[in-house]
Design a protein with these regions (language model features):
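Catalytic metal-binding/acid-base residues of hydrolase active sites
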Residues: 18-20, 47, 110-111, 143
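Internal catalytic-core helix/loop-beta-alpha segment
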Residues: 61, 65-115
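Short hydrophobic segments within beta-strands
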Residues: 15, 106-107, 139
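A short, flexible beta-alpha/helix-coil linker loop
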Residues: 19-22, 72-74, 142-145
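Short amphipathic alpha-helices and their capping/turn segments at secondary-structure boundaries
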Residues: 1-6, 50-59, 94-95
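C-terminal capping/extension of enzyme domains
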Residues: 3-11, 33, 40, 76-92, ...
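Short, surface-exposed acidic-centric catalytic microdomains
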Residues: 23-83
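Short, hydrophobic/glycine-enriched beta-strand segments
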Residues: 11-17
Length: 163
């Protein structure tokens, strides 16, 4: 199982769908070479350099954590079941309530939609937060399958620099 990177007093907790097969195999988040997660964080000014997936644990040094709504690795999020999300939601809310980051950043609209049940979601900070005292921010997935440019992704993630 891919380890979470969690701690108390996090500025931002990045929450993905679930580990991809490659991430699970190598033991690091966002490990697919086409994934732009670490490049986006760097370009948005959230890290001072582009970290590698092997350095994912170092995000804790910046006050950032990593987890997923579902722990089970799959080829893609479309392989997840309703039961995966039901159980994942319970576990994720428990983690959030224990660690209480300032912001939950959902890496993909679908992650927030599955957690919240809210269908109409825009990028950025949300009017309704899932855990009192923790702001919810929805950002695009950084997967190489997402057609947004690095510049477009960066502009959205840059809003998190407030934290």
């Amino acid at each position: 199982m891919l380890p979470d990177h969690l701690d108390y007093d996090l500025k931002i907790l990045f929450i993905g769908f679930n580990p991809g097969l490659q991430s699970e195999e190598v033991g690091h988040h966002y490990a697919n070479p086409t994934n732009r997660f670490f490049a986006v964080l760097n370009k948005a000014g959230l890290t001072d350099r582009k970290l590698s997936p092997e350095e994912d644990h170092r995000l804790l040094e910046y006050g950032y954590g990593l987890t997923n709504i579902v722990d089970r690795p799959t080829r893609g999020a479309s392989d997840l079941t309703i039961e995966d999300y039901v159980q994942g939601r319970k576990h994720l809310l428990k983690k959030i309530n224990v660690y209480m980051p300032l912001v939950n950043c959902y890496v993909g609209k679908g992650v927030y939609q599955k957690l919240s049940g809210i269908k109409k979601v825009d990028w950025g900070f949300q009017p309704i937060n899932q855990v009192e005292g923790v702001r919810d921010f929805v950002a695009p997935s950084t997967s190489g399958l997402v057609r947004m440019s690095l510049k477009e992704l960066t502009e959205i993630y840059r809003q998190l620099k407030l934290y």
